[in-house]
Amino acid sequence: MADLTPLYRETRPYRRCSRCVLDTVGPHPIDFDDAGVCNYCHASDYAVAKWAIPPEDQKIRFEQAIGAIKASGAGRAYDCVLGLSGGVDSSYVAYLAMKNGLRPLIVHLDNSWNSELAVKNIENIINRTGFEYFNYVIDWEEFKDMQLAYLRASVIDIEVVTDQAIFAILHIKAHELGIKYILFGDNPKSERTMPSGWNYQKNDLANMRAIHRRYGRKKLRSYPLMGLYDLDWYRKVAGISYVSLLHYIDVPIPEMKATLEREFGWRDYLWKHCESVFTQFYQGYILPKKFGVDKRKAHITDEVLSGVITRDEAIRRLEEPYYTDEQLREDYDFVTRKFGLTPQEFEEIMALPPVPHSDFPQDRKGFIWALRIKLGRIRAGFCKFFGQAAASCSALSSGTA
């Protein structure tokens, strides 16, 4: 049953950007200028010009950030919270924290989908750094019910279920312990570009509750929830700020990986965000088959625009299959069994037509967020959302700390 024949049917004539690797396949709007350059390249250029830290300022801003974090934690057991998935970005932030004398509480959300490799990478990092580690094990039956609700709803961003729980736990632990800084591993070299319609706002509780109310089958008793208004409270009242250390350095991704391999015995994954078996399957099977989305295009586009690889190299990488036949069969069987679905039941869900998140109720702020994306006034994506939040809410990000 693990057949990658796409259900998604693209109606537009095929065209690929002349500068990056984004194309017309998928639910996203895309436009090209006279030179064949897409609107996402122009949006990236705008974001870099407006928000990127000039190379000559990076060192001082990095040192300011480290100093402010250390000062805030004086007399406390920890000076920051760091969410660790075992992926390259959060792992490298752990390395930077170790090298610069920070005392983070490492927080990990165990949603029962960790790959064996991710578990080993996290274990190696904790052992090498000596950092304190808090592993939040989410109730699997509730979490499974949430994921199945999103699958049955046929919305695109099933990862909302994981991502919003991670945000919630990070803020809850920081506030509980009086910690004022959360370290994020968002990386402008690989997470700046995300086409409109490929994801959704991670903290829209109205949307989440509506989806679960219609398609969920269990009452949520312990699943951690944090909406947009909670997020505002943590920033503005509790005084918790985000720091993205990877915005203050200019280290190529291959060099980051080499450092992690040397320092921690870290090992790389199949593709970006494949620390989770479900995310690996979601990106490699659900998204391309049902929605026409190959997220590698966005991640690799950022590497092209950052000068990490050439466009020709990027095209060659995209020509590589996401999965081998054996890997796909293994993940397909594992995921369907874990969800308690037969292959036929799962494929019936896959065959349902895609439904936009906007077909369900939205928080007012979530609606405005989505509207701005459609108007092209902000760049979609996890990284950009939190990059702008940091710029407006953290003195560090404005360079005034």
Region roles according to the model:
Residues 1-80, 96-401:
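Nucleotide-activated chemistry modules centered on ATP-dependent adenylation/adenylyltransferase
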Residues 80-89:
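Short, glycine-rich nucleotide/cofactor-binding loops
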Residues 92-93:
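Hydrophobic positions on the alpha1 helix immediately C-terminal to the Walker A/P-loop
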